[in-house]
Regions:
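Terminal domain-initiation and capping elements
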Residues: 1-95
């Protein structure tokens, strides 16, 4: 690979790792199980109904649950969408 100055770039060194992050839902006293599970099902891709319910129960029992992990840009999108539906969200955790 050659940059615009004609310098040869080592492809092993020029690949930037995309930052990853975790999306975490927190327990609260006003969202119902049904609402939390429905939000997870409609917003998080490939979320099964069973997984949505399992995560919803985990949020209630332990106070929080990681509902998605992946690239930072997607994490920000899912975080914002879940927050806009009224879910209580932890700050995005970069990993």
């Amino acid at each position: 690979m050659v940059n615009s100055l004609g310098t040869v770039l080592d492809p092993k060194k020029s690949k930037a790792k995309y930052p990853e992050a975790r999306v975490i839902v927190l327990d609260d006293n006003f969202n119902t199980y049904q609402h939390v599970a429905n939000c997870l099902l409609t917003i998080i891709p490939s979320m099964s109904e069973q997984r949505a319910w399992d995560l919803t129960i985990k949020v209630d029992k332990t106070g929080s649950a990681e509902v998605w992990r992946g690239n930072l840009e997607q994490a920000e999108l899912y975080h914002e969408q879940l927050f806009s539906k009224g879910l209580t969200m932890a700050p995005i955790e970069k990993i």
